[in-house]
Amino acid sequence: MHFVIAYDIEKDHCRNKVMSALKDVGLRVQYSVFECDLDPRRLKELKARLSALINRRTDRLHIYPLCDACYFRSESLGLESRDLEA
């Protein structure tokens, strides 16, 4: 299943660890937004990993599931995702 994962992490070192964890499984489409294609097992593992990295009092992390129809109808305007890593 497809997911959009967005985060707002207060501390740089925590933000970098979250970003690294998400780069392992997804495509960075904005500086704090990733698209991931995950089966239920990998999603559960990722949620556990991310939960251990964030501070629940100061940080936010949202996981939005996307059905296939919605995912394939999505559009991008402006810079393509690959330009973020340049």
Language model regions located:
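Short, intrinsically disordered low-complexity segments
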Residues: 35-59
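C-terminal structural segments of small proteins and small subunits
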Residues: 52-86
